[in-house]
Amino acid sequence: MRVITAPPYYPQWQVGENYSAWRYKREEGAATVWRCPLYVPKQPSTLKRLLHLGSFAVSSFFPLMAQRRWKPDRIIGVVPTLFCTPGMRLLAKLSGARTVLHIQDYEVDAMLGLGLAGKGKGGKVAQLATAFERSGLHNVDNVSTISRSMMNKAIEKGVAAENVIFFPNWSEIARFQHIADADVDALRNQLGLPDNKKIILYSGNIGEKQGLENVIEAADRLRDEPLIFAIVGQGGGKARLEKMAQQRGLRNMQFFPLQSYDALPALLKMGDCHLVVQKRGAADAVLPSKLTNILAVGGNAVITAEAHTELGQLCETFPGIAVCVEPESVEALVAGIRQALLLPKHNTVAREYAERTLDKENVLRQFINDIRG
């Protein structure tokens, strides 16, 4: 297996230590990995994000074309970013490989839903982006994506149903099964979180599509309750949120950097209530990957999603799996938090769902069978 990717930079929007944003790097191991240079903005705006994605599409094109001699059987491209699909399709044509375009986020739909394309769906930017997306989706052998509603969206965009594959985000279920209380207590002490207060946890990217301003509002309304809002992660919107919390004097809200891979099970078990927040219009274009591990740990999540979306349907189909509330409503978010805090700390519905449907080995085995045809 060969992988062409970028140096690690997300969600901090900063290239990791021992990596470079300006040089190629080849790594040998179970797979041969080429790390391609790219532009990484410190504060990503719409224009800077496009330059960021475009820079990777250009830098990755050359090592991608070098794989022609290797003659791959399958080429799997991951979206974001759509900018790389022309190169993927060209390599497939030259090598005779079959192609799979895997959709983590519908970039264009998310951009339109969050109003980042100027004049909306009728504007020239939106029309150009939609045409580019259509070309990518219609000229690969298979399209895979992470939810049933996103599969339906691919079909609505003109992909033949028989060419759409379900490839959900997985969880390493065993990691979240037996988490020692001592590990949770140690992490809690390390972060300086008091034992006598319940933890409202948000862990993940801090960007535009989450709408975390409402979490600030919720913390303000709950400032007299024995709660701590712990915001863990990085992203372009973090500094602004920290400033908002400081201006309001929110002593019940604390911000922390992204925690290590090894600390994740203890971090998630520590949360009495988990926040899975998105703006209206993003819920079917993107499916939060953080939810899989929250379910695996048996956490009680408050999800902001409309009833007809994938997340809304999940909560309706599996009663008790999470608390689903109206997006962009502070009142609904506060009510959802209060409801979640009344539930038993361990959510058996969530854990059992994760065991049945999200186990990493099962998900990968099925995907391999699907792309083999």
Residue ranges and their predicted role:
Residues P7, S149, W170:
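Carbohydrate-associated surface elements
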Residues Y19-Y24, Q177-L193, T348:
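A short helix/loop element that forms part of the nucleotide-sugar donor recognition site in Leloir-type
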Residues M65, K71, F83-P86, L90-S95, ...:
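Membrane-proximal helix-turn-helix segments that form the acceptor-binding/catalytic region
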Residues I155, A161, S171-N189, G211:
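Acidic anion/phosphate-binding donor-loop and adjacent secondary structure
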Residues P194-Q210, I216-A219:
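Conserved donor-binding/catalytic core segment of Leloir-type glycosyltransferases
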Residues Q210, P257-L295, A301-E316:
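Nucleotide-sugar-dependent
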Residues P226-G233, K238-P265:
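Nucleotide-activated donor-binding/catalytic signature segment of Leloir-type glycosyltransferases, i.e.
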Residues P327-E328, A332, L341-I371:
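A charged, aromatic-enriched C-terminal amphipathic alpha-helix characteristic of glycosyltransferases
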